[in-house]
């Protein structure tokens, strides 16, 4: 009896396809315990997405935690020998705090880890598997890559104080050029250095073209080395890497990743469905001299693909209008100017008219 995949949810379909993909590439399934000793997460807290975990005292008196991360457990037990590369894949649930609900939630992850002798070829093979994982979803997807060495090299070249970096990185993650520049100047950087930081936000686009643009902005060897590694990756991927994007402003989880990082997106899903990269520093805490790279797919996000469209997207041929309530004063003027600059200006200036509502029928935008 044959079972059609179409009868399963998007997440279930992905599970079947990814399992076949990973096992075909030589990865062995890792089965993690639901609980780990809390001491593991306490010691490696800075490598976790969030320091909050659910703990309990087990029957043997030990303090344990409901697993918030799979990679730590694999890194602890892998212990690859010198020159050996161990490859694992997993299909597990982790428990983490939700920023939206401010409660703990279970997150269904499926991913893989390559640990030990990770060279340029192994790194390219993992990125190729990430691209194939996205392609297995049968929907439009895109993979963005970056390199932590380019960003940290710039911060070092500009002599940004360690205590000031967290604030600057927050604005960089938020893609807020104005606040990033202001914070850089407040830190004591000059206009040229501030411009170099905000310039990171412009280093985003097709991999090849953005590499060329980034080379012209390099200030140190660390940045040039990072770009060379990305060039080697592009060459190794060849046609498989077509459509890959480069975003050198990517600054997520810098405590965790130390080199290549990548993020996958799916059309119709607002958050990333895939995250991964190099985490050599973490791996070397368990096995000196070893390197590691891996990624995880967030299968819960895929269920959005099966959710019905919101009413505004079910209107057939009718136009969907964007209604914007502008605040009074300079804040409203600034917001309108930004929107107008993006092509959403009204047919008449809302400041010069007595009308309470102005609109642009072509852009389907209305201001109050």
Residue ranges and their predicted role:
Residues 1-4, 216-219, 268, 357-364:
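Short, basic, glycine/proline-bearing loop/turn elements
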Residues 1-67, 124, 128, 355:
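TRNA-binding/sensing appendages of the translation machinery
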Residues 7-25, 36-37, 69-82, 86-140, ...:
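Positively charged, Gly/Ser-enriched RNA/tRNA-binding surfaces
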Residues 27-32, 243-244, 342-349:
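Short secondary-structure junctions
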Residues 32-51, 146-156, 250-259:
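Beta-rich nucleic-acid/ligand-interaction surfaces
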Residues 51-58, 160-182, 189, 266:
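Acidic, His- and aromatic-enriched active-site or binding-groove loops in soluble protein domains
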Residues 142-146, 325:
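Short internal beta-strands
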Residues 316-368:
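N-terminal hydrophobic or amphipathic helices and topogenic motifs
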């Amino acid at each position: 009896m044959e079972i059609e995949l179409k009868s399963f949810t998007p997440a279930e379909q992905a599970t079947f396809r990814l399992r076949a993909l990973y096992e075909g590439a030589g990865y062995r399934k890792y089965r993690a315990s639901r609980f780990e000793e809390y001491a593991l997460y306490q010691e490696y807290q800075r490598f976790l997405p969030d320091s909050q975990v659910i703990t309990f005292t087990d029957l043997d008196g030990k303090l344990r935690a409901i697993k918030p991360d799979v990679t730590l457990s694999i890194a602890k037990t892998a212990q690859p020998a010198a020159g050996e590369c161990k490859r694992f894949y997993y299909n597990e649930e982790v428990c983490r705090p939700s920023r939206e609900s401010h409660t703990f939630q279970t997150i269904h992850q499926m991913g893989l880890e390559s640990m030990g002798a990770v060279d340029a070829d192994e790194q390219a093979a993992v990125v190729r598997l990430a691209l194939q994982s996205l392609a297995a979803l049968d929907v439009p997807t895109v993979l963005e890559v970056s390199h932590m060495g380019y960003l940290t090299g710039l911060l070092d070249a500009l002599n940004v104080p360690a205590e000031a970096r967290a604030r600057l990185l927050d604005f960089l993650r938020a893609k807020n050029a104005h606040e990033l520049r202001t914070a850089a100047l407040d830190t004591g950087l000059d206009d040229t250095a501030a411009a170099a930081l905000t310039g990171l936000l412009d280093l985003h686009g097709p991999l090849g073209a953005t590499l060329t643009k980034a080379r012209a902005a390099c200030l140190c060897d660390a940045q040039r080395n990072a770009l060379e590694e990305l060039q080697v990756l592009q060459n190794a991927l060849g046609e498989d890497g077509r459509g890959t994007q480069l975003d050198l402003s990517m600054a997520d989880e810098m405590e965790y990743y130390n080199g290549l990082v990548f993020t996958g997106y799916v059309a119709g899903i607002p958050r990333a469905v895939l995250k991964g990269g190099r985490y050599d520093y973490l791996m070397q805490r368990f096995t000196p001299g070893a390197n590691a790279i891996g990624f995880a797919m967030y299968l819960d996000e895929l269920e959005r693909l099966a959710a019905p469209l919101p009413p505004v997207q079910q209107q057939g041929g009718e136009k969907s209008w964007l209604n914007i309530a502008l605040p009074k004063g300079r804040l409203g003027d600034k917001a309108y100017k930004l929107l107008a600059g993006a092509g959403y200006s009204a047919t008449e200036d809302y400041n010069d008219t007595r009308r309470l509502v102005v609109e642009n029928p072509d852009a389907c935008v209305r201001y109050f």
